[in-house]
């Protein structure tokens, strides 16, 4: 490897650390790293615990290996190699699990989608894939109310009001540990959801009682089948669109900061908070806003298929990641189709929850092998 380049980088880091307060452990670690790769290392103390505490993954293994080789500590070197072999085997099992389950689900999804296509060509308007082009919700409000709910209830509250409020009270999430950041994510999202739903309620209150079929929750219907079936079909569709999308963005996709935190988290409490946020709170709030309110409202101005596409695009745009608009629009279209066919928000909420849960589980399994 480029040892000289690495040593130069560590020396530069050491210089900058000496100018900072509360950086003593990192200063000691930098000194150890520089000394370990010298031709004749002179270690003033036993740095094993310092390395184990401050380095992770491959960096910890490589540094400890160098330390034990310098010390000629063959017993510890053998133990380290055995540990790394066990970690490597565990990582292989996890990668197989992460890769196999979505592939199996995708295969089932492709089969289900092909079956639905054949049924559509054979049965026509009686098929599950058929969309009643004349279907429209009775919508007493106009486009001004639609924009009011979206702009004020979703974008303004989430992107302007809440950040300003947290900044005003001096709350900086960057200074928190992982548990603190997890709680911050949950509190900020739930606050946005409650505020958004309150604005939705106040905006629609003048039109009470609402016409039939608005915001339907039917727990005794077949919503579970619609949710699971929609999830299986979404897997291959979103995967194909994502692969195409990669070509446009040269692999430089956006990223939800929640996913990055979840990748680092190996704390049950933190993961539980992330699960509540992504797999419970987000599906409930976003399905009420985008499938429960926006999609039906748009049927006043366009056919049902147009409302599904338009609401899906707004849903994707609301995630504020330009490079992920195509995959998220595809997911939104599946969510919209499931909702319009089932006429039950529980179905799209289940699909949404399964999607987010699958992402979190994959990141947890990947992150658990990083230590």
Predicted regions and their residues:
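Juxtamembrane helix-loop-helix connectors linking adjacent transmembrane helices
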Residues: 131, 164-189, 202-281, 369-371
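Alpha-helical membrane-inserting segments
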Residues: 113, 161-170, 195-203, 233, ...
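Active-site His/Glu-centered metal-binding helix of metallohydrolases
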Residues: 284-289, 293-294, 321, 354-358
């Amino acid at each position: 490897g480029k040892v000289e380049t690495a040593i130069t980088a560590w020396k530069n880091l050491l210089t900058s650390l000496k100018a900072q307060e509360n950086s003593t452990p990192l200063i000691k670690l930098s000194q150890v790293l520089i000394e370990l790769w010298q031709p004749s290392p002179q270690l003033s103390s036993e740095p094993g615990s310092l390395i184990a505490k401050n380095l992770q993954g491959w960096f910890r293994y490589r540094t400890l290996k160098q330390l034990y080789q310098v010390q000629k500590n063959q017993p510890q070197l053998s133990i380290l190699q055995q540990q790394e072999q066990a970690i490597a085997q565990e990582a292989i099992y996890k990668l197989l699990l992460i890769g196999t389950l979505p592939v199996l689900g995708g295969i089932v999804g492709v089969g289900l989608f092909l079956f639905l296509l054949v049924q559509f060509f054979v049965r026509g308007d009686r098929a599950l894939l058929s969309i009643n082009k004349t279907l429209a919700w009775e919508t007493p409000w106009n486009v001004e109310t639609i924009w009011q709910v979206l702009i004020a209830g979703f974008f303004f509250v989430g992107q302007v009001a809440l950040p300003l409020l947290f900044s005003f009270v001096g709350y900086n999430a960057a200074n928190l540990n992982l548990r603190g950041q997890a709680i911050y994510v949950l509190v900020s999202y739930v606050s946005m959801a409650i505020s958004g739903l309150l604005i939705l309620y106040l905006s629609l209150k003048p039109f009470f009682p609402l016409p039939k079929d608005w915001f339907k929750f039917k727990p005794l219907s077949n919503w579970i089948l619609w949710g699971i079936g929609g999830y299986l079909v979404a897997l291959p569709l979103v995967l194909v669109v994502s692969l195409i999308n990669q070509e446009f963005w040269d692999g430089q996709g956006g990223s939800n900061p929640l996913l990055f935190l979840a990748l680092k988290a190996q704390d049950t409490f933190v993961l539980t908070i992330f699960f509540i946020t992504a797999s419970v709170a987000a599906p409930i709030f976003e399905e009420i806003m985008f499938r429960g309110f926006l999609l039906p409202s748009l049927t006043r101005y366009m056919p049902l298929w147009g409302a599904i596409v338009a609401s899906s695009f707004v849903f994707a745009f609301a995630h504020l990641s330009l490079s992920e608009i195509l995959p998220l629009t595809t997911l939104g279209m599946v969510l919209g189709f499931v909702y319009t066919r089932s006429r039950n928000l529980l179905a799209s909420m289940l699909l949404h929850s399964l999607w987010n849960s699958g992402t979190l589980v994959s990141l947890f399994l990947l992150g658990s092998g990083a230590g």
